[in-house]
Amino acid sequence: MEFQKVIESRRSIRKYDAEKKVSEEQIREMIQAAIYAPSWKNSQTARYYCVLSQDMFEKVRTECLPEFNANNVEGASALIVTAVVKNRSGYERSGEPTNELGNGWGVYDLGLANE
């Protein structure tokens, strides 16, 4: 697929067909692609956790997500939970933040990788 077409056809999915299942291999491919996203000073602070079991999916959906997002993931066959290692991206080796954004750099990088 041509890159411009990929960009133009990108969508935020908010309704899932419970009959359609994503395979573990497809999930691995998505996470592998995200890992190649650039990060602040190549700090690579993104972490990915995949929720495949229905019991854990429901627990995360009902106990961890805001109501709007909990409703949006109904019917999805998996959740990919993303997190960032704190106090690394946006920080110098001395442990001091590079600027006022501090941990914001890691969150920013994670958002870009998730796209």
Describe the function of each predicted region.
Residues M1-I27:
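Specificity-determining recognition surfaces
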Residues I7-E8, P38, E58:
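Short alpha-helical segments used as structural interaction elements across diverse proteins
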Residues A18, A37-P38:
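Short helix-to-loop capping/linker segments positioned immediately adjacent to catalytic or ligand/cofactor-binding
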Residues N42-G111:
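Glycine/small-residue-rich phosphate/adenosyl-binding loop
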